[in-house]
Every structure is written in C-alpha cells, then in structure tokens.
C-alpha cells in the first residue's frame, strides 16, 4: 500500500505471506515524523511490528529518530566480475514471465519464517533495479531453485537465491550463482553485491568458494512495535 502525507511517501507491505502482524515499510521520501505516522496507521490496522529495509548504519538515523531499534543483521559480500565464472553445473534459464506466487512456495520452503519475504517481497526484489532477471533451474520440468539478479550503474545485485530443500546439496545454488554472475557481466556490471544471514554458514561457504569477499560493513533491519 502507498502511504502519503504531503510531499512524503512510503510503501508498506506484509513482511511475508504467513502473518499480517509484521509489516515492511520502505521510505521513499520524508522524515522521522512521517515514519512515525506510518507506524501509527499500520498499528490501527492490526500490525504489531514494523520493519525497515536492510540498510547500513550511516543511513539509519531517520529511522532511529522515529524510535526504530536493531532487529536483524546481514553480512555483505562482493565479487569483482572481471573474470568469467566457471560454467554452471545445471541448465539455468531466464524465466520470461516469472510467477511470484510459485516462487514464494520455494522461498518459504528454503528459509525459516524470520527470513521469508513472500510474494510481495519477491515482486519488490524483481523491481529493485531497472534491469533484472529471474533465473531458474528445473528438475523434471519443475522449478527446483531460482535467483533474482539485477543491475544498476554497473553494479549487480543478487537479490534472492532459494533452492527447494528437496533438491538441496546437488549444486543447484552454485549453478544459480554462476549463471547470475554471467548474466551480470553480459549486462555491463563490474561488481556483484549480495547479503546473507550471519548464521547461514552454508551460503557463506558457497559464496566464498565462488570468489565473493566478505565486507566489513553489515546491514541492519530495524524494527518498531506498532501497538
């Protein structure tokens, strides 16, 4: 839903498809008072907690002035794209008309409830950059894993990667990473950036094995109780 007050504007959506009591709020323009008003509006509609987008600490001041506090933390990885990646281990294809609802089923199975983003979150990920693609690996004709990759100003973002647990440990995630790097290079990106949960050691090993370097900076999701 679009929230406006004069010049200020924000977008709000459910944090995921499992609960309406958690909401994600993305500020387009405005200050801490407007953020507070958005939290109040959401609380009146049953939202118990409002979460910010993931952001570095130097961009969080307006949220903290509105009463938001640290909630979740993400580590950031970066890869130089000058060298081509090894070939994927599976056939990876760009989906010309991805179905967010179908992808959300895989996403829900791949992540625990805290990190699920639901259909609306996947739509946001696809629209986060001017150029993007959904890459998929199919097993027996059914999508077993997907990646959402985008590019803007020569920087590529691996927005989301999920593999159905029934097909885990078969190299599908590795294939999607390599195909995402190849897509990014073909679309003019010079670096790729991604983030993941600090406790996701399997993902960390995969990314580091594929040439990603962990940066010192971390991203934080902030939260404020809505009611």
Predicted segments with their positions:
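A short beta-loop-alpha structural element at the N-terminal edge
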Residues: 90-103
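Acyl-donor-binding surface of acyltransferase catalytic domains
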Residues: 25-89, 218-222
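Helix-loop element at the rim of GNAT/NAT acetyltransferase active sites that forms part
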Residues: 105-117
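A conserved beta-turn-beta hairpin within the catalytic core of GNAT-like acetyltransferases
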Residues: 9-25, 71-73, 150-159, 168
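Conserved active-site alpha-helix within GNAT-family acetyltransferase domains
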Residues: 56-72, 170, 174, 186, ...
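Conserved acetyl-CoA-binding loop-helix of GNAT-fold acetyltransferases
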Residues: 29-40, 163, 169-182, 186, ...
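Conserved hydrophobic beta-strand within the GNAT/NAT acetyltransferase core sheet
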Residues: 50-53, 158, 192-196
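A conserved beta-strand-loop-helix scaffold within acyl/acetyltransferase catalytic domains
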Residues: 12-15, 120-134, 138-140, 144-162
């Amino acid at each position: 839903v679009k929230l406006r007050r004069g010049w200020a504007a924000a977008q709000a959506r459910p944090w995921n498809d499992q609960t309406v009591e958690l909401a994600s709020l993305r500020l387009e323009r405005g200050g801490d008072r407007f953020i507070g008003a958005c939290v109040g509006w959401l609380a009146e509609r049953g939202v118990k907690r409002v979460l910010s987008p993931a952001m570095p600490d130097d961009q969080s001041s307006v949220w903290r002035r509105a009463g938001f506090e640290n909630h979740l933390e993400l580590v950031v990885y970066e890869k130089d794209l000058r060298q081509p990646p090894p070939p994927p281990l599976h056939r990876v294809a760009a989906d010309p008309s991805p179905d967010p609802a179908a992808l959300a089923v895989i996403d829900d199975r791949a992540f625990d409830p805290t990190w699920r983003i639901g259909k609306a979150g996947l739509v946001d990920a696809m629209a986060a950059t001017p150029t993007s693609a959904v890459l998929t690996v199919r097993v027996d004709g059914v999508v077993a894993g997907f990646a959402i990759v985008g590019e803007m100003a020569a920087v590529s973002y691996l927005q989301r990667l999920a593999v159905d647990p029934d097909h885990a440990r078969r190299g599908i995630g590795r294939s999607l990473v390599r195909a995402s790097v190849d897509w990014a290079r073909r679309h003019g990106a010079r670096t790729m950036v991604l983030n993941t949960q600090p406790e996701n050691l399997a993902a960390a090993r995969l990314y580091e094995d594929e040439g990603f370097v962990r940066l010192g900076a971390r991203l934080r999701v902030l939260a404020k109780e809505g009611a």
